[in-house]
Amino acid sequence: MPYIKYIQNGDHYKEVLSKVSKVKESVWIGTADIKDLYIGDRPFLGVLSDLLKSGKEVRLLHAKEPGPIFREEFDRYPVLAKNLERALCPRIHFKMIVFDYREVYIGSANLTGAGIGMKSAARRNFEAGILTDDFGLVDAACEQFDKVWRGGHCKECGRKDFCGDPII
């Protein structure tokens, strides 16, 4: 029986972000904003690096280039430059994480400390989303992500002037 769980505020860190390191095959991440983020005392990019080293697929879609701290962290993990599948699209505003094509988080939280991360309760954003293994929702999220990933919107896009790294 499928489940749908409402996720709010700090539960994003406990219920969603903690699942990334446990994927068996792949993780697809879509976010408007991405910043240096930690899981416990470990950089999130270190977690992604470990996944790639163990042969997992990691895809990252985001709307804009991250800041200098993120880029410094990124450079500490050479496997990311080599194996991380990454694309930019300035129209990305969805926030979703697909775990092994079987489970999906869909919600408001960006991949930042104030969004999905572990910023203190007094400083974090108020976020809401769902975590589910409902096939219809997982399939729809995968299709939306993959259509952007394949450049399915690029030909008719009205924001090409803002696209620094076109998908197609």
Task: Give, region by region, the residue ranges found by the protein language model.
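PLD/PLD-like phosphodiesterase catalytic module centered on the HKD motif
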Residues: 1-168
